[in-house]
Amino acid sequence: RRSKKLLIYYNIDTPLRSHHKFNEHKEVGKVVDKILSGEKIALISDAGTPGISDPGFLAVRTCLENNIEVECLPGATALVPALVNSGIPFERFVFEGFLPVKKGRKTRLEKLTNEDRTMIFYESPHKLLKTLNDFSNSFGADRKISVSREITKIYEETIRGSVEHIINLFTDKIPKGEFVIIV
């Protein structure tokens, strides 16, 4: 989608193959076979860094298991700018990514109630209020958090305050964009 537009813009005509959570187990073997036969492969992501709340880990691990060295280029991931811009101490932090949707969500949050490191979560707009309400119940309505959206894009925004304050803001304003929540 976005990657193809970028490649076209720079006149790069390398063939693209989709690699996503629904096909990565099937595709990873093909990727390894191509590399072992001498082809060069690049794993790119439409938004963020492969393997960070995106498919990619399985491909990297399988390559390493087959003695294929992987070169990782530094690139964008929303968690670092959101963390730095949060105003919350981040000497030690833990990346949680997306919380489980149903099974295991409550258990995961219960385990995190005693976490003393800064926590980083990803969330989609249609689940943001539910997640914030879950945070209020698990971590307390007065807990200071930061919510960033659309990192490095035109409508980038970071809101800081208590969980309760941010819930009130998004109750009146429909959430848009992809979110990074720092707790």
Predicted regions and their residues:
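Class I S-adenosyl-L-methionine
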Residues: R1-E71
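Short, well-ordered secondary-structure micro-motifs
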Residues: G29, D54, A82-V84, K106-E110, ...
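Short hydrophobic/aromatic-enriched beta-strand-loop microsegments
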Residues: D13-H20, V70-E71, E91-G97, D142-S148
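Small/polar loops that bind or transfer phosphate-bearing groups
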Residues: H19-H20, I44, L73-P74, G97, ...
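RNA substrate-binding interface of SAM-dependent RNA methyltransferases
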Residues: R1-P15, L79-V80, V84-V94, K103, ...
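A contiguous loop/helix-start segment that scaffolds small-molecule binding in enzyme catalytic cores
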Residues: E39-K40, R117-T118, Y122-V183
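Class I SAM-dependent methyltransferase SAM-binding "motif I" and its flanking Rossmann-like core
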Residues: L58-E115
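Short, acidic/turn-prone active-site loops that include or flank metal/cofactor-
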Residues: R1, S18-H25, A76, G97-V101, ...
